[in-house]
Amino acid sequence: ALMLQGVDLLADAVAVTMGPKGRTVIIEQSWGSPKLVQDVANNTNEEAGDGTTTATVLARGANPVEIRRGVMLAVDAVIAELKKTLNDELEIIEGMKFDRGYISPYFINTSKCEFQDAYVLLSEKKISSVQSIVPALEIANAHRKPLVIIAEDVDGEALSTLVLNRVGLQVVAVKAPGFGDNRKNQLKDMAIATGGAVFGEEGLNLNLEDVQAHDLGKIQEITEQLDITTSEYEKEKVTDALNATRAAVEEGIVLGGGCALLRIGIEIIKR
C-alpha cells in the first residue's frame, strides 16, 4: 500500500504536465524520490530521449501486456497512415567552439550575443584605430549582415566606435583564443571553416583598410557569452536534446504536441 501511495504521488504530479497544454509542477524534495517509477522514467528517457511523462503514467496502473496488444493491433494501420506524409530529411551543420567571450557587455542582444548569417573578420593583430575597421563595417552594413570581429584584441577608438555603432549595426568583438603560435593556428582553423582570410598573417599582404567582401568569413549562426556557467537544469536540457536527436536520426520523428496521435486516432476509428 505504501509503495502504491508513492507511485500515485509521483504519477499524479507528473500526469498534469502531459501534452501541449501541460501545467508546471513544483515539488519540494524533503525525502527520497519514488525510485521504482523514477527508474521507469529514466530508462525511457535514455532509450527514446522523451516520453518520461507517458511512461510514468503507464507505470502507475496500466497493464503493459494489454497496451502492447492494443499497439500491435493498430501498428500496421498507423505506419501506413504516417507513411503518406513521410519525408527523409537529415541536415548536419559543422561548427566550432572556443573559450573566449565578447570584449564588452554592450555587445549583447539577449542574455548572450547571438547572430545569424554573419560576416567574420579575423586578425592576428590588435585593432585600435577606427580607420582599420571602417571598411569592414561598411561592407557588413551594405550587405545587411552582422559582423563578428575576432582579433588579438580590440581597444581604444576602435572599440568605442563598435560600441557606438551597435545601435545601427549588429557587431561584436571577440578576443582570439590561445597565445602565440596556438592562437595563429586557431585563427587559421577559423579561416578555413568560414572561408575567410586572416589579416596580419605572415606571408599574406592583407591590410584591414583594404578588406573586400570575399576576405570576410561567413557563418550561419554564432553565440557569444561573457563566460560559461553550466547548471544542472541546462545539463538536463542538453541531455534530453541529445537523446531526442539520436532517436530522431535512428527512427525519425512525428508532429509533436499530440498532433500525430490525434490524426492517427481519427484514422483508426474510421477503420
From Swiss-Prot:
Its EC number is 5.6.1.7. InterPro entries: Chaperonin_Cpn60_CS, Cpn60/GroEL, GroEL-like_apical_dom_sf, GROEL-like_equatorial_sf, TCP-1-like_intermed_sf. It is found in: Mitochondrion matrix. The modification N6-acetyllysine is found at residues 83-84, 97, 112, 125-126, 145, 188, 237, 270. GO terms for molecular function: ATP binding; ATP-dependent protein folding chaperone; isomerase activity. Gene3D superfamilies: GroEL, GroEL-like equatorial domain, TCP-1-like chaperonin intermediate domain. The modification Phosphoserine is found at residues 30, 33. Chaperonin implicated in mitochondrial protein import and macromolecular assembly. Together with Hsp10, facilitates the correct folding of imported proteins. May also prevent misfolding and promote the refolding and proper assembly of unfolded polypeptides generated under stress conditions in the mitochondrial matrix. The functional units of these chaperonins consist of heptameric rings of the large subunit Hsp60, which function as a back-to-back double ring. PANTHER family: 60 KDA HEAT SHOCK PROTEIN, MITOCHONDRIAL (PTHR45633). This is 60 kDa heat shock protein, mitochondrial. It comes from Mesocricetus auratus (Golden hamster). The lineage of its organism: Eukaryota, Metazoa, Chordata, Craniata, Vertebrata. The gene is HSPD1.
